[in-house]
Curated annotation (Swiss-Prot):
Residues 340-351 have a biased composition (Basic and acidic residues). The lineage of its organism: Bacteria, Bacillati, Mycoplasmatota, Mycoplasmoidales, Mycoplasmoidaceae. InterPro entries: Ribosomal_uS2, Ribosomal_uS2_bac/mit/plastid, Ribosomal_uS2_CS, Ribosomal_uS2_flav_dom_sf. Gene3D superfamilies: Glucose-6-phosphate isomerase like protein, domain 1 (3.40.50.10490), Helix hairpin bin (1.10.287.610). This is Small ribosomal subunit protein uS2. One of its GO terms (biological process) is translation. Belongs to the universal ribosomal protein uS2 family. The gene is rpsB.
Length: 351
C-alpha cells in the first residue's frame, strides 16, 4: 500500500483536486467570525481547483468538524492543517478535511476492490464504540472497541490461539454437547466466553492481519498505530490538532471529539466500501436534508443560583429536605439559636 506523500509534493484526490502545500506554513493568529467557518477562504499554503466533495461544507460545519482543541494542547506538526485561531480553540482548515477525506475514500475503495480487509478502532467512550461497531458491521469489517491488546497485530499467532478458543467455546455453547458438562463447568465456560467476547468479539472471524486500520483517535490508540507501522499496514485516522501527522498514512484533519463529526466521517469512510460493493450509502451521494446527525445533550449545567435565598447552595438543589431544613428557618430563629450556641461555648470556657 502506498504511504501518504510529503506535504511539499502535489497530491491528487478523487475529484481532480490539486493541493500544493508548503512545509513552512504558519497558523493565522487573528480571530475569525462564524461566517468564516462556512466560507472558509483557502489558506495561503494550499491551492484547490475544481473541488467536488463527498460531503458538503455546510454539513461538516454543522457537525463541528472544523473546531479544534485549545492551543495549549496542540501539536505544532499539525500547523499545516489549521486555518486560524479563534477564541480558545484552533480552527481546522475544513477544505483540507474534504481533500484528505477524498484521498482516504479513494484508497479504501482500492483496498476493497482488491479484496482487502479493514479494521475499525475506537476505544474512547461508549458512543464512539457504538458508532465503530455499527459501521464495521455495515461493511463486514473487523473492529476493536475495548482496550487495545498488545500484540493484536505483531503477535498474531498468540491472538489466533485466543480466537480459536473463543470460537470453540461459541460452537460448544450452541451445540447439545454443552449438556454433557456439569452446571459448574457450564458456568465457567460461559464466564470465559464472555471475557473473550469483550476483547475479541469484533475480530472473531479474522484469519489474517487487516490490510488497513481506521482510527477515531490516533492519540488515544497510539499503540495500534505503532504495531501497524512495524508491519507496514496503512493507517487512516481522524486527527485533531493534538495528533502527530507523521504517524498517520492517510490523515483526515477533523474534530474527533464531536459525536456528530465522527458520525459523518466514519459514515463516509464506510460508504467507500459499501459503494464499491453496490450497497446503499449512508452519507455519500445523499442531500443534506437526508443526512441525520445524532442529537447530543449540552454538557453545561443550569445555573440555579438565587442570591435572594439566604444560605443558598446549588449543591443541595436536588436534596430538598437538606435545603429546606437549612433555609426554612426564620432570621429571628437563626439569630436566637446562634446566641444560645454562643452562651454554651462561653459557659464551657468558664468551667
Amino acid at each position: 500500500m502506498s504511504q501518504m506523500e510529503n506535504s511539499t509534493k502535489k497530491v491528487e484526490s478523487v475529484a481532480d483536486v490539486e493541493v500544493v502545500a508548503t512545509e513552512n506554513a504558519k497558523v493565522e493568529q487573528k480571530p475569525t467570525s462564524p461566517a468564516d467557518a462556512i466560507q472558509l477562504k483557502v489558506n495561503a499554503n494550499s491551492t484547490i481547483k475544481n473541488l467536488k466533495t463527498l460531503v458538503s461544507i455546510v454539513k461538516l460545519t454543522e457537525s463541528g468538524a472544523h473546531i479544534g482543541l485549545n492551543p495549549k494542547k496542540w501539536n505544532p506538526k499539525m500547523a499545516n492543517y489549521i486555518h486560524a485561531k479563534r477564541s480558545n480553540n484552533h480552527v481546522i482548515d475544513i477544505l483540507k478535511t474534504i481533500l484528505f477525506l477524498d484521498r482516504a475514500y479513494k484508497f479504501l475503495q482500492e483496498v476493497a476492490q482488491n479484496g482487502g480487509t479493514v479494521m475499525f478502532v475506537g476505544t474512547r467512550g461508549r458512543v464512539v464504540k457504538e458508532l465503530i461497531k455499527a459501521e464495521a458491521e455495515r461493511t463486514n469489517s473487523f473492529y476493536v472497541t475495548q482496550r487495545w491488546l498488545g500484540g493484536t497485530l505483531t503477535n498474531f499467532a498468540n491472538i489466533s490461539r485466543s480466537l480459536k478458543k473463543f470460537n470453540s467455546n461459541l460452537a460448544l455453547l450452541e451445540s447439545e454437547e454443552i449438556n454433557k458438562y456439569s452446571k459448574k463447568e457450564q458456568i465457567a465456560i460461559n464466564k470465559e466466553t464472555a471475557k473473550l467476547e469483550k476483547f475479541y468479539g469484533g475480530i472473531k472471524t479474522m484469519k489474517q492481519r487487516p490490510d488497513v486500520l481506521i482510527l477515531v483517535d490516533p492519540v488515544n490508540d497510539v499503540n495500534a498505530i505503532k504495531e501497524a507501522r512495524k508491519l507496514n499496514i496503512p493507517v487512516i485516522a481522524l486527527a485533531n490538532t493534538n495528533a502527530d501527522p507523521q504517524l498517520i498514512d492517510y490523515i483526515i484533519p477533523v474534530n474527533n471529539y464531536s459525536v456528530k463529526s465522527i458520525t459523518l466521517i466514519l459514515g463516509v469512510l464506510a460508504d467507500a466500501i459499501a459503494e464499491l460493493r453496490g450497497e446503499p450509502t449512508k452519507i455519500v451521494g445523499r442531500p443534506d436534508s437526508e443526512i441525520v446527525l445524532p442529537e447530543t445533550k449540552s454538557s453545561w449545567r443550569q445555573n440555579n443560583y438565587d442570591p435572594s435565598k439566604r444560605g443558598y447552595n446549588p449543591k443541595y438543589v436536588n436534596h430538598k429536605s437538606t435545603f429546606n431544613k437549612f433555609n426554612n428557618k426564620k432570621p429571628a430563629e437563626a439569630t436566637s439559636q446562634a446566641k444560645t450556641n454562643e452562651k454554651i461555648v462561653i459557659k464551657a470556657e468558664t468551667n
